[in-house]
Amino acid sequence: MATENNWSFEQTDIAERLATVDDAALDVLQFGIIGFDEQTIVQRYNTFESQLAGLNKSRVLGHPFFTSVAPCMNNFLVAQRFEDALATGDTLDVTLDYVLTLRMKPVKVKLRLLAGSARALSYVLILRPLPS
């Protein structure tokens, strides 16, 4: 799925690109991007995700991702993978099918989990079906 400025959910260098662009560049993309620090405090949240999740940026930025923003991801499939990568210093780049359930009817999505010891932020990318 190609998007603005040759970004795609699947591209291999997306973690490196995320580290080098400003938030305005993320806001034109057609998939969700949530970036958080080692304490899981959300630092980046793009417009696409805000609109489809129904959570405005002020409700998300500066808040703990797994406990306040997305408790439906506070589980072994998602949160634990980030904890393990942080503990071991390993790079995390995994894509998985997932069902989002918080504040909405269940929605099938693809998640891409990105983390690495050399990166300031970890990311959850969310590929959703586009509204009709």
Show where each model-derived region lies.
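Short, charged amphipathic alpha-helical "coupling" segments at sensory-output junctions
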Residues: 2-21
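PAS-family sensory domains
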Residues: 23-25
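Sensory/regulatory domains in signal-transduction proteins
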Residues: 31, 36-132
